Amino acid sequence: MSFSIRPDRRFPICCPVIYHVGLREGHGIVWNLSANGWRLSGDVPLRIGQTCPLTVNVPGQHPLFVAGVTLRWVRGQEYGVETVVVEKQTHSRLEHWITRLAQKSVECTP
């Protein structure tokens, strides 16, 4: 396994997620996110290289639909996915959410 540095900062979250693999619907939790990726766990197995859509239930907002993520790594039922297809409006919502998370993390720093 090669080592690589992530290009974007990841922020811890805990949000329900639904994803679709073929005819199967998976349910899980998103544990962290960045501008380009997500770490999630789920009940339907995924394989490296698979592409699937995600619907993330963001607290206090409408669900965030990401049309396509590609699976980059697997550890048991934990998955690292890269965002590859997202609508412009959804991308703007995601950027706004990340900006808010970044501001909160600065406020919490002693």
Locations of regions flagged by a protein language model:
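Structured alpha-helical
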Residues: 1-110
